[in-house]
Curated annotation (Swiss-Prot):
Function: Implicated in enhancement of V-sense gene expression. Acts a an inhibitor of C-sense gene transcription.
Region feature (Disordered): 255-314
Keywords of the record: Activator, Covalent protein-DNA linkage, DNA replication, DNA-binding, Endonuclease, G1/S host cell cycle checkpoint dysregulation by virus, Host cytoplasm, Host nucleus, Host-virus interaction, Hydrolase, Metal-binding, Modulation of host cell cycle by virus, Nuclease, Nucleotide-binding, Nucleotidyltransferase, Repressor, Transferase
Protein name (record): Replication-associated protein A
Annotated source species: Sugarcane streak virus (isolate South Africa) (SSV)
Keyword Metal-binding among record annotations: yes
SUPFAM superfamilies xrefs: Origin of replication-binding domain, RBD-like (SSF55464)
Length: 314
């Protein structure tokens, strides 16, 4: 049976730390056989010399199965990998079973079937401080919360463990625990992946962009064209005009005359000044261009010789 540690919930966290000779695991909604789970845990902690492993199947309220595992070893099992105890994609709730007696009694309260190996070693130190046991010392709230922070692997598990260990504080200070949960286990932001393949140069799907331009910027409906052109009276005429404009606007039309390449320079015209003003008054015209032949229309008129007319009678 392989150990899977690649799921989101089992990603190694720098905050996670487990170190204890008694390990209590709960696999929620796990259909695996207790024997297979127990054998896997036994081989998994072989480095720390296992002495007892109990694997119990329990029926949940929704009809599914839970697996509880109590693992005891001669040396403390130490790991900072929250996915260390994962089995075939199933991630357990991991706790330090400081009161092995209570944990074993809890796991065996209503078993469907179970598997165990080795010799159970009773422990008298209670995780929450059991006053019924002799020489027991009640654990402080700081120690309880510290242990929860070290063993929780996600936000939901952290709040659930707080609720079980400190119910009054959970009910009266839930907003503070939720804040600390968000800080301990921040949401992982998804990396954006473009749906379009990379191109050269790196453009984003020019075909889709061109289609958008055609439908939004370069398209005019016949009805809108008729409103802008009152002389267009029918939809057929408007459609015909739009088709013509569409084809014409995408066809290079020759200008009809080539660009001038002559290096000759025109003479610079004289700027207006006193001389020009005098010409305007006297009626003279100053030519600023090349000489031209001007034809002046003349009309015949009767001229009289210059003579002295004496008034009077002979």
């Amino acid at each position: 049976m392989s150990t899977v540690g690649s799921t989101v919930s089992s990603t190694p966290s720098r905050r996670f730390k487990h170190r204890n000779v008694n390990t209590f695991l709960t696999y929620s909604r796990c259909p695996l056989e207790p024997e297979a789970v127990g054998l896997h845990i036994w081989s998994l902690i072989a480095h720390w010399t296992p002495v007892y492993v109990l694997s119990v199947r329990e029926t949940h309220e929704d009809g599914g199965y839970h697996i509880h595992v109590l693992a005891q070893s001669a040396k403390p099992v130490y790991t900072t990998d929250s996915g260390f105890f994962d089995i075939d994609g199933f991630h357990p709730n991991i706790q330090s079973a400081k009161s092995a007696n209570k944990v074993r009694a809890y796991a065996m309260k209503n078993p469907v079937t179970y598997w165990e190996r080795g010799t159970f070693i009773p422990r008298k130190t209670s995780f929450l401080g059991d006053s019924t046991e002799p020489n027991s010392k009640k654990q402080s709230k700081d120690d309880i919360v510290r242990d929860i922070i070290e063993h929780s692997t996600n936000k939901q598990e952290y709040l659930s463990m707080i609720q079980k260990a400190l119910p009054y504080e959970w009910a009266t200070k839930l907003q503070y625990f939720e804040y600390s949960a968000n800080k301990l286990f921040p949401d992982i932001q998804e990396i954006y992946t473009s749906p379009f393949p990379q191109s050269t140069p790196a453009l984003l799907d020019p075909t889709a962009i061109n289609t958008w331009l055609e439908n939004n910027l370069y398209q005019v409906s016949p009805s809108a064209y008729m409103l802008a052109n009152p002389s267009c009276l029918t939809l057929e005429e408007a459609t015909s005009d739009l088709i013509w404009m569409h084809e014409t606007s995408r066809t290079l039309i020759p200008t009809g005359s080539s660009a001038c390449t002559s290096s000759g320079q025109q003479e610079q015209a004289s700027p207006p000044g006193p001389g020009a003003w005098e010409d305007i008054i006297t009626g003279r015209t100053t030519s600023t261009g090349p000489p031209t032949t001007r034809t002046q229309n003349t009309t015949s008129s009767t001229t009289y010789p210059s003579s002295t007319v004496h008034a009077g009678s002979n």
